[in-house]
């Protein structure tokens, strides 16, 4: 995630803004509708990044364990390939010693296919995307990304396409989810990160976060982090239709002190507002899509025990994780380095109870939309927090260093791949 001096981009014309507003990104809880066929069960997939597994949990209630799948069945083959290539080895070790905090990153993001037959996984350290058969545990297809690291993904509303950020190549690939064939790609800012399809699948929003592994973390050195921007691409032609430079918007809002590296983000149900976190900040901002300006800011409490040394904050993330209730009334925030999560009222921006959590690194919405589920990467568990009360419901142990949590589907009665 690297940065150069930020580009200033001309404001979008009104017609384009209106078009994008009308086709704005879907709420975080939206998932592709399963294809007709064998009975499916909705579940939560939890990617255990340092372990290379995904735990599969009930999507509601007690988040009971359903099964587990190994998402690196080809580990030995991939390692041989890496160790025989000095350039690949250099990046592999670089990931381990920076973003990986001394560990390899084996699973970043996951989505299931519409028929519930496979889970598609981006694997940072292996610089690829794979489809793993849920019945056999074998790899159906593999797509090596450009460059040397794969990152966040997004699935199209119909479930047929998956987008993945190739973070060292400043590229987003869009793949056929069934075959792994590339349908197209587009260029981004430095270190592309989050991806979001619009509700009709027409546009794809990507945010780039720049270099979050350098130690040049003082506010006055923020410009060294690279070219950070939102790139909106046509998901059919893969041409860029809009670029949003948040540096200019933050300056206009009176917050030149804040980083313009956009981290997790959520759109309101009517898709008129974007809520986003930025590097080094304990809080989030509200952006009006039609008027192209930042309208509100929420600063959340600091944990007195959190170090003030910004170089100790993992990948520049003070707070990293956000989801919105399906009705748009509440935001769930993961306060990563401050070791809590909280539910915020969207109308008033008042936060609820601060729920203690150990390095929470993601937030998603459960299957019935009544709770958010956070990954506690420091404690190897996931925790459900009630949207209505802001109180913790349940915690469930998972594997080593859970990060991304996604809703998906598996065949009814599935408890894991068949042995052998």
Regions inferred by a protein language model and the residue ranges of each:
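Short amphipathic alpha-helical segments with coiled-coil-like heptad repeat character
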Residues: 1-4, 62-64
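Secretory targeting and sorting signals
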Residues: 2-30
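Predominantly soluble domains enriched in secretory-pathway, periplasmic, or organellar proteins
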Residues: 28-420
């Amino acid at each position: 995630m690297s940065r150069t001096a930020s580009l200033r981009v001309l404001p979008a014309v009104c017609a384009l803004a209106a078009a994008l507003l009308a086709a704005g990104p879907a709420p975080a809880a939206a998932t592709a509708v399963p294809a007709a066929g064998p009975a499916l069960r909705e579940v939560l997939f939890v990617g255990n990044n340092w372990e290379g597994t995904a735990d599969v949990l009930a999507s509601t209630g007690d988040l009971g364990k359903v099964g587990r799948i190994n998402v690196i069945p080809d580990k030995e083959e991939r390692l041989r390939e890496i160790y025989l290539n000095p350039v690949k080895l250099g990046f592999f070790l670089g990931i381990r010693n920076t973003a990986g905090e001394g560990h390899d990153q084996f699973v970043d993001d996951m989505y299931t296919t519409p028929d519930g037959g496979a889970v598609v996984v981006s694997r940072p350290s292996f610089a690829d995307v794979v489809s793993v058969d849920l019945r056999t545990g074998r790899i159906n297809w593999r797509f090596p990304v450009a460059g040397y690291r794969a990152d966040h993904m997004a699935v199209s509303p119909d479930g047929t396409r998956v987008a993945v950020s190739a973070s060292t190549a400043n590229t987003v690939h869009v793949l056929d989810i069934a075959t792994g064939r590339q349908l197209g790609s587009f260029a981004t800012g430095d270190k592309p990160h989050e991806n979001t399809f619009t509700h009709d699948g027409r546009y794809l929003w990507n945010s780039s976060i720049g270099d979050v592994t350098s130690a040049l973390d003082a506010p006055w050195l923020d410009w060294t982090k690279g070219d950070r921007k939102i790139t909106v691409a046509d998901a059919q032609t893969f041409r860029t239709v809009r670029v949003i430079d948040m540096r200019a918007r933050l300056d206009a809002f009176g917050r030149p002190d804040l980083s313009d590296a956009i981290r997790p983000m959520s759109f309101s149900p009517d898709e008129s507002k974007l809520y986003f976190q930025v590097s080094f900040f304990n809080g989030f901002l509200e952006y009006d899509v039609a008027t192209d300006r930042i309208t509100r800011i929420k600063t959340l409490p600091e944990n007195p025990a959190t170090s003030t040394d910004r170089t100790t904050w993992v990948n520049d993330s003070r707070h990293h994780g956000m989801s919105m209730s399906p009705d748009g009334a509440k935001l769930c925030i993961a306060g990563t380095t401050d070791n809590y999560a909280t539910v915020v009222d969207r109308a008033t921006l008042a936060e609820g109870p601060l729920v203690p959590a150990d390095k929470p690194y993601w937030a998603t919405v459960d299957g019935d939309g009544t709770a958010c589920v956070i990954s506690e990467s420091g404690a190897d568990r996931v925790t459900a927090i009630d949207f209505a009360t802001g109180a913790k419901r349940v915690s469930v142990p998972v594997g080593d260093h859970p990060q991304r949590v996604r809703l998906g589907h598996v065949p009814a009665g599935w408890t894991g791949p068949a042995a052998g």
